[in-house]
Amino acid sequence: MKTKITDTSNAINAGGRAEKWWKGKPVKSRSSSWTRNQDDVDLQSILQRYNLKGFEFGNWLNNNERYDRVLACEDSLAELSKIIGSKNLGIESLVGIAFGARGMSKAAAHYEPGYNMINITKMDGDGCLAHEYGHALDYNLGKYVDQNKRYNYLSGGRSVSKTLTGNQGGNLRNIMNELVDEASSMLNVRLDEYLDKKFGKNPKEENMRRAKARMQGSFMYWRYRHEIFARLFEQCCCYKLKQKQSSDMFLTSSWAFYTKSNAALFYWPEAEFKRLLPKMDKLIRVFKITLNIK
């Protein structure tokens, strides 16, 4: 019989929806411990292996769903550690992972820099771990390792600038910005061409001008520098698995999703991606060196 899986510590729930729910139920006690046997998922072993802060589970995940998420996540962490070349994925226990505990409206998954938590939603979070982990790398290595007074994120965060002259630093920050500059340039050309083709370069009709402006506004999110890096990182993880004739649908989406689906507009066609790959590989090598420093 499976033992009930619960959060790995009381501290991990800070800021989560599950914490808020329990705060509103003061007459109920909450279990914060669990007993392992040989049939159980060993949460502490996974945390120690990858230096993670902890796991958090939403109240709306039943025990079987918790097992499924943890087992899928464990496999994905193993793949991620091979791609990066380090098991220090939690960056000295800074980063934790939540399952269905911190959901945001319309978001399949998200990263919370304030609490350093990656949240994978109950229903739609499959394929999102690499993307959100890319955010965690970008933020933590920028805030604590290769620092810049203006930008916590190595990439420059929510800036939409094609280049950031003030975002200078050491190897991590400089290589990251070379990569994001080039990826941003490719993406912006493609998005602008799409808008011009759909509405015309200078539409004469008022309704077309307004429609184009609305779509330009909706594209802003896709132009954020930290989002560009996270999407490129997840696409890179998928490509590395594809090279081994493998896939991991909890870690990333399929290669066809990135290159042939409707979402492909916001990623990089294979030819463009391969032009970016040497810079991405260079950055991953520096990630490896940084994460493996004792």
Residue ranges of model-derived segments:
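Active-site-flanking segments in enzyme catalytic domains
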Residues: 2-69, 86-294
